[in-house]
């Protein structure tokens, strides 16, 4: 895609939405070129008509048909042509995705606009049908729009005259004319925007702004105030108005750039909202002046009549107060159409041939008809052209044949657009200059040369050299592109050749030269054809002005008759003929040489191709031979592989059978082992059950004995408690008796004192002493007052004395007066307590003897013998309250007490027991405690023998338990080894490492075996510690403290100091029990431990000491 050189910065801003529809390029567009012989002038605003101006370009007709009938296509992503040109740099290759776009066109399209819009145009373009946009306009602007000034004040506005006599206010400033006065070129009379003709305008040209009514892009027209172009025999006339009616945005009423929406039946923005696939779904043109019924009659199949005249009267002046602005502008369009019809009638009188009046099946002045589709329109145009102008095609061919050599390229490009559409033309009249009275037969007329034959290029063929140096091909370019996109040419070193004799290039080079997406899109360097001189015939007369250069343009009708221009050149023509012949001979000679060289080259190429073909045949034969050998080798290899595979399968089958037999043998062996293990386990379970039953019976007997002892202990405790309670009651009774005796003594003293006082009072008063009872005043209350007069005759005194004498005695008075029992003395109390303590001690001795007997018979008892000396020791005298409930200690629940443990340690240390003689508590209790001392001494003497027998029994039981545990655990690992013999072997070993090595040699070195050995060593240490056996070389635990040396050892050691050569005898070590210390090593929470700080609280200050 190449860029457009005439683009301006404002082109993108003034983008017209109508360019979104697919349009075909044409020469009559803006910026197109106008051919005028050798003088080619580029029209800026209005494109000219090629081929002498008599023929309208076929691309223009096609573009007109496409613009009218093509449906608008709405895309999700729309890109303007200007935007695509900005994004794509010059010389770049377009992407493949761009070709698939709906609006893509490979040919260059002209720009829509190069001039910025005015303020009114921008307002109307943004919202052209909005009442809001109209409300923003002023009254003058609305009047201008009603007259067509908003869209008609552009390129076609004349500087002198406007519609309805309006003044040019707020319009575009016209640029200066590009016209240059030359004697051989017609000039326009007005600059851009007015006049009959524009730049390079003449009777033939339709210049910029003049002569073209409603141009293709809407630029200019006489309806905007400019005078019409001069009508002559070559002007388009009525045909141009009919042709303009086909353009979208054009038509007879088109004004300004892009056409007016008032004169057009379609609005591009509104048309895009309808379904493009439904021909009936089209916008409808509403005539504001017509009624609803009239507008419905004008519609046919959903299409509005384009360019049709209104049914309302056009003679009436528009009323601005009655009709809207767009309706008022319609009257101006109608008046413009009437002016065009008048101009067309004048032009028909001057034309040399009748105009085309029915080329699109319409009549001048009648209402326009509507085609159903594009095919309908093309058929109508073709029929009209064939019926009305059959001889014009031959004249058109003659004119095209007389064109210069440079013309066919443009003709071909234009004829490819609509090849089957015949276009009516206006042939030129050569009789105006060939049949001149003065120059008839003497003018030089060059012989028309036939156009250069169009040689169709052969399709491009590609070859490539594969990695085996074999040339592959030929392949078409499309196939190579497909393979490249599919990813077959990934190797950039692959060599590719274009054509038979092209140069080999790698894929990487082609990517760098032509792009990574299309490396095969490039042109081959072809030698340009040699120029051929035209044949010049001998002239019959002198030739004026050498019009050969203008022969192809048919401009003779527009040029005047040359006068008095004669030039006789007879000798000169002969020289030209001679020179021409010489040049022709040289050319023929060169052609012959070239033909000979070409023949030789072809022969050499044929030989080379033959050799290459033979070489390829030989290479193919060698390749086939190699392939056959490879196939034979592969077959032999496959046979060997098959044999090896079969042999391997047989070997695998044998191995599977062997493994199966081994697995079966292993299963049988495992079942036998399991059966043996099950039998052993059964026997072991029976032994364990028997042992458990025995143990259960022993435990039950022990439990019964323990319960019996506990019951007896509870009975003894209850008896002791009752004795204590009775003693307390007796003491309380004695205290109460003492208190009562003291009270009686007090009452007696008070009674005696009262009697003495009464006697004293009677003696002093000389009266009879009143009789007073001996009852206690504290219990009887205060005595009655004796009459102070003391007369016996008083009745009150007599009755009172009688009542006192005969008062009944209180119940407790008899008890007080009863004789009291004598109290026990302190000696009697002590004797009674000693008697009770003796009885209690005898009971405890009997209980202890029974307990020792039960400990000897019980195998589960451990520390029962240690409490034997507890009851043998004599106790000092104490009160009955000292016999607490803890006097009995159960060896099964509480274990040996601290005193029993200390006594046992003392008995082990001394060879013979010593009899403890307790101190006498009191002289009176010495004789009473003697029998108790004797019994305690007897128990202490007999205790060592009993403990020794018990100890031996415990060691044997612990060893048996350890052996049973070892055998049970060892058989879990292996049942083939005699575990009892192994136990006896390792029990004599002191080193734990040796024990571990022996056990692991029979089993394995797994983690479970090591744990088993460690547990065995720990249990052995615990058993030896419990049995009192010292472990001299046991390094797994801390060393034990050495026992204190005995008297015999100390004596021997002192005596051994005399003999220097004698070896010192090692002292026997002894394991000490922690209970001997009488305390535990753990920290107590209720006392201060090491490392703690004792904070002494400060004493409060006594305020009295200040």
UniProtKB/Swiss-Prot annotation:
Q: Where is the composition biased (Gly residues)?
A: 207-224, 248-261
Q: Where is the composition biased (Polar residues)?
A: 1-17, 162-180, 229-243, 306-322, 786-801
Annotated spans, Disordered: 1-50, 160-370, 383-434, 778-811, 909-928, 1026-1076, 1087-1106
Species of the source: Caenorhabditis elegans
- Gene3D superfamilies reported in the protein's UniProt record: 3.30.1490.40
Could you name the domain of life of the organism this protein comes from? Eukaryota
Listed SUPFAM superfamilies = GYF domain (SSF55277)
Instruction: Please list the residue ranges that the record marks as compositionally biased, kind Low complexity.
Output: 30-42, 334-353, 390-410, 1046-1057
Q: PROSITE patterns under this entry?
A: GYF (PS50829)
Q: Give a GO cellular-component term.
A: cytosol
Q: List each coiled-coil range.
A: 584-746
Upper lineage is: Eukaryota, Metazoa, Ecdysozoa, Nematoda, Chromadorea
Q: What is this protein called?
A: GYF domain-containing protein gyf-1
Which Pfam families does the UniProt record give?
GYF
UniProt keyword annotations, A-Z: Coiled coil
Domain GYF: residue ranges: 459-508
């Amino acid at each position: 895609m190449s860029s457009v050189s005439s683009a301006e910065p404002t082109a993108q801003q003034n983008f017209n939405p109508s360019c979104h529809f697919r349009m075909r390029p044409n020469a009559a567009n803006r910026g197109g070129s106008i051919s005028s012989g050798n003088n080619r002038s580029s029209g800026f605003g209005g494109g000219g008509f090629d081929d002498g101006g008599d023929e309208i370009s076929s691309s223009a007709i096609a573009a007109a048909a496409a613009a009218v009938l093509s449906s608008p296509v709405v895309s999700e992503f729309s890109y303007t042509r200007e935007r695509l040109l900005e994004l794509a740099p010059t010389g770049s290759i377009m992407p493949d995705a761009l070709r698939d776009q709906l609006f893509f066109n490979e040919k260059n399209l002209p720009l829509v606009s190069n001039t910025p819009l005015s303020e009114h145009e921008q307002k109307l373009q943004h919202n052209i049908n909005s009442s809001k946009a109209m409300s923003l306009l002023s009254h003058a602007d609305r009047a201008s729009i009603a007259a067509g000034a908003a869209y008609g004040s552009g390129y076609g506005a004349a500087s002198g005259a406007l519609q309805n006599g309006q003044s040019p206010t707020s319009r575009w400033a016209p640029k200066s004319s590009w016209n240059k006065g030359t004697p051989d070129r017609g000039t326009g009379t007005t600059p851009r925007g007015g006049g009959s003709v524009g730049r390079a305008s003449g009777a033939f040209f339709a210049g910029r702004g003049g002569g073209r009514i409603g141009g293709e892009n809407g630029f200019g027209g006489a309806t905007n105030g400019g005078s019409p172009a001069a009508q002559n025999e070559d002007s388009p006339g009525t045909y141009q108005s009919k042709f303009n009616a086909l353009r979208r945005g054009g038509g007879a009423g088109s004004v300004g750039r892009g056409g007016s929406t008032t004169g057009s039946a379609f609005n591009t923005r509104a048309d895009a909202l309808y379904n493009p696939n439904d021909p009936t779904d089209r916008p409808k043109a509403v005539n504001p002046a017509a009624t609803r019924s009239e507008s419905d009659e004008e519609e046919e199949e959903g299409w509005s009549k384009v360019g049709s005249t209104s049914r309302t009267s056009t003679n009436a002046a528009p009323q601005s107060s009655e009709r809207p602005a767009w309706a008022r502008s319609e009257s101006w369009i109608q008046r413009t159409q009437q002016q065009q019809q008048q101009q067309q009638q004048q032009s028909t009188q001057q034309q040399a041939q009748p105009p085309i009046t029915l080329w699109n099946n319409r009549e001048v002045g009648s209402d326009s008809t509507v085609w159903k589709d594009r095919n309908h329109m093309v058929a109508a145009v073709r029929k009209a052209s064939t019926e009305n102008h059959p001889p014009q095609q031959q004249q058109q061919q003659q004119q095209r044949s007389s064109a210069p050599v440079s013309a066919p390229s443009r003709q071909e490009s234009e004829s490819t657009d609509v090849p089957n559409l015949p276009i009516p033309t206006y042939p030129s009249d050569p009789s105006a200059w060939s049949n001149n009275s003065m120059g008839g037969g003497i003018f030089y007329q060059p012989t028309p040369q036939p156009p250069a034959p169009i040689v169709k290029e052969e399709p491009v063929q590609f070859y490539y050299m594969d990695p085996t140096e074999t040339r592959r091909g030929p392949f078409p370019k499309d196939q190579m592109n497909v393979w490249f996109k599919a990813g077959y040419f990934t190797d950039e070193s692959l060599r590719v050749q274009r054509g038979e004799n092209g140069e080999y290039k790698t894929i990487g080079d082609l990517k760098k030269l032509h792009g990574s997406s299309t490396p095969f899109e490039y042109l081959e360097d072809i030698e340009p054809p040699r120029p051929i001189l035209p044949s010049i015939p001998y002239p019959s007369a002198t030739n004026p002005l050498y019009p050969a250069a203008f022969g192809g343009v048919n401009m003779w009708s527009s040029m005047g008759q040359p006068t008095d221009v004669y030039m006789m050149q007879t000798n000169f023509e002969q020289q030209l003929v001679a020179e021409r012949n010489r040049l022709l001979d040289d050319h023929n000679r060169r052609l012959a040489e070239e033909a000979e060289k070409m023949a030789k080259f072809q022969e050499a190429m044929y030989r080379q191709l033959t050799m290459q073909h033979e070489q390829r045949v030989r290479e193919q034969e060698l390749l086939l031979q190699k392939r056959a050998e490879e196939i034979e080798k592969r077959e032999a290899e496959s046979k060997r592989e098959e044999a090896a595979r079969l042999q391997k399968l047989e070997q695998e089958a044998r191995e599977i059978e062997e493994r199966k037999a081994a697995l079966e043998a292993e299963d049988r062996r495992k079942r036998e082992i399991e059966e043996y293990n099950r039998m052993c386990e059964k026997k072991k379970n029976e032994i364990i059950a028997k042992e458990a039953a025995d143990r259960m019976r022993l435990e039950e007997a022990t439990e019964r004995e323990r319960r019996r002892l506990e019951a007896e202990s509870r009975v003894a405790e209850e008896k002791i408690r009752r004795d204590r309670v009775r003693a307390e009651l007796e003491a309380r009774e004695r205290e109460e008796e003492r208190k009562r005796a003291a009270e009686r003594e007090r009452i007696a003293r008070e009674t005696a004192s009262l009697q003495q006082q009464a006697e004293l009072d009677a003696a002093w008063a000389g009266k009879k002493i009143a009789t007073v009872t001996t009852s206690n005043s504290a219990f009887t209350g205060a005595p009655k007052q004796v009459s102070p007069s003391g007369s016996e005759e008083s009745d009150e005194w007599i009755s009172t004395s009688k009542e006192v004498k005969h008062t009944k005695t209180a119940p407790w008075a008899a008890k007080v007066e009863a004789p009291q029992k004598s109290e026990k003395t302190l000696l009697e109390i002590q004797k009674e307590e000693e008697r009770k303590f003796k009885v209690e001690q005898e009971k405890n001795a009997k209980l202890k003897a029974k307990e020792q007997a039960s400990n000897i018979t019980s195998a589960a008892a451990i520390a029962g013998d240690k409490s034997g000396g507890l009851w043998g020791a004599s106790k000092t005298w104490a009160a009955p309250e000292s016999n607490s409930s803890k006097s009995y200690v159960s060896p099964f629940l509480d274990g040996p007490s601290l005193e029993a443990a200390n006594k046992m340690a003392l008995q082990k240390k001394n060879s013979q027991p010593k009899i403890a003689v307790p101190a006498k508590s009191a002289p009176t209790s010495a004789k009473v405690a003697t029998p108790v001392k004797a019994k305690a001494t007897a128990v202490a003497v007999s205790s060592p023998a009993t403990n020794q027998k018990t100890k031996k029994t415990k060691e044997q039981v612990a060893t048996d338990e350890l052996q049973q545990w070892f055998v049970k655990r060892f058989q879990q690992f292996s049942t083939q080894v005699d575990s009892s013999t192994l136990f006896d072997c390792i029990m004599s070993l002191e080193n734990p490492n040796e024990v571990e090595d022996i056990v692991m040699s029979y089993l394995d070195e797994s983690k479970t075996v090591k744990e088993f050995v460690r547990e065995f060593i720990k249990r052995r240490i615990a058993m030896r510690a419990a049995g009192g056996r010292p472990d001299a070389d046991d390094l797994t635990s801390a060393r034990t403290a050495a026992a204190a040396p005995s008297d015999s050892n100390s004596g021997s050691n002192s005596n051994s100091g005399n003999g220097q050569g004698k070896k010192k005898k090692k002292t026997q070590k002894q394991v000490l029990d922690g209970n001997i210390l009488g305390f535990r090593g753990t920290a107590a929470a209720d006392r201060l431990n090491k490392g703690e700080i004792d904070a002494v609280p400060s004493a409060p200050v006594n305020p009295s000491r200040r």
